[in-house]
C-alpha cells in the first residue's frame, strides 16, 4: 500500500507497515509486549541514525522535514 500520509509522535501506528507510518527521520513505530498498543515514538540518540537510514526509502518521506542522517556522536562532540 502506498503511504500517502504519516502519523505524528504519540499517534497509534501500524506495526506491519514499518516505520514509514510515522512522520520524522528519527520517529519509529514502537509497540508494547505482544505487538499491541503501537505508537509513534522518537528514537533515542543511539538508535536515531539506524532509524533514519531505514526511512530514507520511505515513499512518503517528503511529508516530513527530512534531514541528513547523522552518525551518532560518540565523543568529543561540539
Swiss-Prot record:
SS bond partners: 6-23, 13-29, 20-52, 22-40, 31-38, 58-73, 69-77
Tissue specificity, please? Answer: Expressed by the venom gland.
**Which keywords, in A-to-Z order, does the entry hold?**
Disulfide bond, Knottin, Neurotoxin, Secreted, Toxin
Query: What's any one GO cellular component for it?
Result: extracellular region
Q: Which Pfam families match?
A: Toxin_34
Q: Where is the protein found, in the record's own terms?
A: Secreted
For this chain, one GO molecular function annotation is:
toxin activity
Family note = Belongs to the neurotoxin 04 (omega-agtx) family. 02 (Tx1) subfamily.
**What's the record's remark on domains?**
The presence of a 'disulfide through disulfide knot' structurally defines this protein as a knottin.
Please explain the role this protein plays, according to its UniProt record.
Answer: Lethal neurotoxin. Causes spastic paralysis and death in mice in 4-6 minutes after intracerebroventricular injection at dose levels of 1.5 ug per mouse.
Report the protein name in the record: U5-ctenitoxin-Pk1a
Q: Which organism is it from?
A: Phoneutria keyserlingi (Brazilian wandering spider)
